[in-house]
């Protein structure tokens, strides 16, 4: 490659994975990433402390970075499932994702990414409908702010065991979502490719 990679990509990093909170101070981490000219984007997640959140917002506003927001930790930490067949628990996950949209907007992100929850074979069809319900609600809220909602495709039978899941299932879900919301898309992690069976052409379905 003759040219810099930045000519072709916005190179970013996931803040909480590059600098795990158990080992790194959040503000120091953001400063480090923002001062590294190699990066032009950063993905952050929910910040519990209001004062710290304000400081991070200020740092990001002063930086050259495109801001992305990952809501996955907000679901995985408390064990919430956006496709939970129990309606009350599903609503809890939905509320967390709607709050994530608001926090993402505050921090300067153009949308959020999240993942589907675990599933059981005998309730898979119901779980699919529950996930549609959750995602449509979150997309409706995000659309009012001009923001995107992206579902990250994970493995369906190994580590995360997420409903979305098999690539053909992801393509079907995206098609169903796009009949009602044009601010929905799929987010694909290259490291997940081997765990999603045969991958159909659905890298990103968004406007």
List PLM regions with ranges.
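An active-site-proximal structural segment forming one wall of the substrate-binding cleft
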Residues: 86-109, 127-145
């Amino acid at each position: 490659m003759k040219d810099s990679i930045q000519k072709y990509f916005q190179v970013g990093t996931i803040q909480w994975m590059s600098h795990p909170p158990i080992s790194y101070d959040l503000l120091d981490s953001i400063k480090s990433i923002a001062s590294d000219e190699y990066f032009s984007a950063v993905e952050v997640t929910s910040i519990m402390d209001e004062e710290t959140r304000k400081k991070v917002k200020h740092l990001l506003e002063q930086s050259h970075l495109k801001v992305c927001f990952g809501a996955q930790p907000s679901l995985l930490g408390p064990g919430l499932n956006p496709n939970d067949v129990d309606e009350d628990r599903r609503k809890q996950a939905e509320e967390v994702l709607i709050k994530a949209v608001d926090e993402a907007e505050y921090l300067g992100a153009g949308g959020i990414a999240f993942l589907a929850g675990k599933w059981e074979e005998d309730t898979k069809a119901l779980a699919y409908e529950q996930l549609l319900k959750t995602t449509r609600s979150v997309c409706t809220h995000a659309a009012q702010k001009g923001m995107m909602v992206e579902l990250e495709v994970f493995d369906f039978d190994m580590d995360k065991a997420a409903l979305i899941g098999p690539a053909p299932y992801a393509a079907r879900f995206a098609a169903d979502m796009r009949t009602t919301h044009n601010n929905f898309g799929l987010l694909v992690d290259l490291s997940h490719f081997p765990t999603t069976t045969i991958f159909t052409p659905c890298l990103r379905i968004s406007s």
